[in-house]
UniProtKB/Swiss-Prot annotation:
The gene is frr. It is found in: Cytoplasm. Responsible for the release of ribosomes from messenger RNA at the termination of protein biosynthesis. May increase the efficiency of translation by recycling ribosomes from one round of translation to another. Keywords: Cytoplasm, Protein biosynthesis. One of its GO terms (molecular function) is ribosomal large subunit binding. It comes from Xanthobacter autotrophicus (strain ATCC BAA-1158 / Py2). This is Ribosome-recycling factor. GO terms for biological process: cytoplasmic translational termination. NCBIfam families: frr. One of its GO terms (cellular component) is cytosol. It comes from the Bacteria.
Amino acid sequence: MTTGTFDMSDLKRRMQGAVGVLRDELGGLRTGRASASLLDPITIEAYGARMPLNQVATVSVPEARLLSVQVWDRGMVSAVEKAIRDSNLGLNPNTEGQVLRLRIPELNQERRQELVKVAHKYAEAAKVAVRHVRRDGMDHLKKVEKDGEMSSDDLDRLSKDVQKATDETIAEIDQTLAQKEKEILSV
């Protein structure tokens, strides 16, 4: 937001950033169903640097509860296998040549409830981030109006727009959480 003006698109972009972070965090929750994004946080020591798994291998989902990791460089297979074992995801790869197969174990009801709580925590953090963006926007609007660069009518109109954008983003967060909760609890 620049001085003297108010950039609503920047405000919405920042709010959507919070939703994007939430989706990334929820994508990393293991739900008992195979998903290629489950392995996104894993990095491998390769070629003298830490690299994401998707830069040294292809991850696919051949079955609902099976991940397949096709490592491109034969010399990297053991490093990829070690990184997956050390990832705290509870996955145990079976290696067949350059392909690692990962069976996704069933989740018990207690673990599902724990995952739902974690998902709620992530969603609440996203809502707090959106509220911070709203507060920044409202503070900026009040400052611009106080400096005489905006009428009180414009302030009221833009304040309502900021609140509407906030409400829409919070609703999107709630919808994303509800989808993930349903996915976690479905057996």
